[in-house]
Design a protein with these regions (language model features):
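Conserved beta-alpha structural segments and adjacent helices that either
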Residues: 1-331
């Protein structure tokens, strides 16, 4: 049935309903699409827990392929009081992987909260990414200013993404695009060696010849520098939904929650908030705008009924249905 699905996905605004799938069988279907095509797949789970389960399941099915994960930046959904630096790192890694994607397609797993968050524009990310190689000359004061501009915090020792330290001719920096921090050793103004190191032991792990430092993708957003994930996706992308109607309802509710939170910030009830001078449309895409973005994509929906079966949608989209008729195995 994978070939039938791939055939239905050829039109740029394809709409396909997979009827009668159960449990995690959809992950087998998505992995089969990956193996038999060059489509990039964006799988939109219902929530963070569901997304992590899908990512782990796909990673087990496709051991040699890194399954990308786009989480939300905040520790609590739509509560802007505390960002999760590890999640910002994962978001940056996903964008970096999409920027450098080779032929064959990527698989990204996300959920509504995370998808609604705006991202730095593609050209802005490229422009603000620093590349270093051994043997290059750098000015340490310039590096210091640049890291601060990139949203990094100077500390005595580096433990988390977004931190850096300078001790003599050694610069430690935890990029928002790498699982381990980097140690840059200088001889005068020349990069003598580059290594990754363990933040727990502070001991060097692996020597490398070049590195990429990605900025805090949530820092210094203006209306002109933000975009959506769709800017990073190739034309041959398929969007997967467990329940598109539920998704539409959820993004409306969550956007209303975000508006309420922003009203508290603007009213001064939350003192000295970092987003005091920002607007909500610098951080989140409005539900109607997100739906417009999705309308231009290929979509696969699961379940026995599709939102695209109503008359209004059928005037615009041609819905194809594939029946799997799976039944639960007796326990």
């Amino acid at each position: 049935r994978t070939q039938e699905l791939l055939q239905h996905l050829q039109p740029s605004q394809a709409r396909v309903l997979l009827r009668g799938t159960i449990g995690s069988s959809v992950n087998f279907i998505a992995s089969s699409v990956f193996m038999q095509s060059d489509f990039t797949q964006l799988i939109i789970a219902n929530d963070a827990e569901d997304a992590q389960y899908i990512q782990n399941d796909l990673q087990n099915l496709l051991e040699k392929k890194e399954i990308l994960y786009l989480p939300a930046s905040y520790k609590k959904a739509y509560s802007f009081s505390e960002q999760n630096n590890h999640h910002i790192l994962l978001r940056a890694q996903t964008l970096n992987a999409l920027l450098n994607a080779k032929k064959g397609g990527e698989i990204i797993v996300t959920f509504p909260d995370a998808l609604q968050e705006l991202l730095v524009r593609k050209e802005k990310l490229i422009e603000n990414t620093l590349f270093l190689k051994t043997g290059e000359k750098i000015d340490i004061d310039f590096m210091l200013d640049l890291l601060i501009e990139y949203g990094f915090n100077r500390t005595d020792f580096v433990y988390e993404p977004g931190e850096f330290s300078i001790r003599g001719g050694i610069i430690d920096v935890f990029s928002f695009g790498n699982e381990l921090p980097y140690r840059i050793e200088l001889f005068d103004d020349e990069v003598e060696s580059l290594r990754t190191f363990d933040p727990e032991t502070q001991l060097s792990e692996r020597k490398i010849s070049e590195l990429t430092i990605i900025p805090n993708i949530n820092a210094h957003f203006t209306q002109e520098t933000v975009s959506t994930l769709f800017e990073f996706l190739p034309e041959k992308t398929v969007i997967w939904f467990r329940d598109y109607a539920f998704f539409k309802e959820l993004i409306e509710k969550q956007y209303d929650k975000a508006l309420e939170e922003f009203e508290k910030i603007k009213s001064g009830k939350i003192k000295e908030h970092p987003f005091l001078n920002k607007t909500l449309n610098q951080l989140f895409i409005a539900p109607d705008e997100l739906i417009k973005e999705l309308d231009n994509c290929r979509m696969v929906e699961l379940g026995n009924k599709s939102l695209f079966e109503d008359e209004i949608h059928l005037q615009t989209f041609s819905l194809q249905t594939i029946n799997y008729n799976q039944t639960p195995k007796p326990s």
